[in-house]
Amino acid sequence: LAWGDSRIGNVLYQDFRPVAVLDWEMACVGPRELDVAWIIFAHMVFQELAGLAGLPGLPDVMREQDVRATYETLTGRALGDLRWFYVYSGVIWCVVFMRTGARRVRFGEIERPGDVESLFYHGSLLRRLLDGPDEGVA
């Protein structure tokens, strides 16, 4: 079972310990790499947004090597290559940004963009990912 929307914003904490996980509408049967890549990629998206806002973000948080090591230590299971799952996550984030952009247009918050890709705030991240594994994505 894959959670589907594994990210820090969907976890409730009490005394710095997770006590509940929320937002299960993307749950599905899938490999563990789906959720692991999603949580890392979600952080990369927010890191990209921080950069667009001129902020440093948290570049030392949710690094693949750290998440992978922690996951493997806690579960005793090795993870496979996450690249395909990052691309998948990037495409799903495109859908999310298109939907939120359409809603903003509908309610008059923004003008309809001439190029829908301008709504992909993580576009440069996705392009780097598609360009190849040595482009500094993870």
What are these language model-derived features?
Residues 34-75, 89-107:
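Active-site activation/catalytic loop segments of kinase-like enzymes and analogous catalytic loops
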Residues 77-89:
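All-alpha amphipathic helical-bundle segments outside canonical DNA-binding/catalytic cores
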Residues 17-19, 78-79, 133-138:
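Conserved NTP-binding catalytic cores of kinases and kinase-like/nucleotidyltransferase enzymes
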Residues 18-22, 63-77, 121-127:
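Short amphipathic alpha-helical segments and their helix-coil junctions
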Residues 28-31, 56-59, 114, 118:
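Pocket-edge positions in alpha/beta enzyme catalytic cores
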Residues 1-4, 21-23, 40, 86, ...:
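Short beta-strand segments
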Residues 1-34:
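Active-site acidic catalytic loop and adjacent metal/ATP-binding pocket
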